[in-house]
């Protein structure tokens, strides 16, 4: 059963990228909760589940349609800062998502998402937030050439490296900032989820590229 107003299409082609992302988040809810208990107020996993648990998998529909649905899910269903941040990011991504896949156009969409997230809360790289994964991924796409497979793989690596960097930092934004040094050594769960989006994207793109020659 799909829930209005944020349901994805019940018919059409499977959206492999976003299905892979949502599946990964589903499978890691307990891990996300544990991380946030160490470096926050412990509700991050609950908020992710609230946003995504109602979806029947696989998700169906084109990227813009599913991104729009995910945006509404986070804005309507998820509580806390994470709902607003991810809802804002997915909304900007959906609004700018290209009809024809190209590295340059996707880079512009991701950059728009980053800009909206930073405008929302003012976070910068080093503040131990989603921006620590999103900003390097956006920069990697900005600098990439037209090889879709290579560009998305590079963006995924950049996001993962950004997550790793959050382990050695303390938070300067949100409730995680209240715990100070207790957050050091713990990766930011929001940055981690952001990296999974790029990881899923790169993985599905690699599969598609091995099946066709549309990537170069």
Language-model-detected regions and their locations in the chain:
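N-terminal loops that bind phosphate or other acidic moieties
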Residues: 1-216
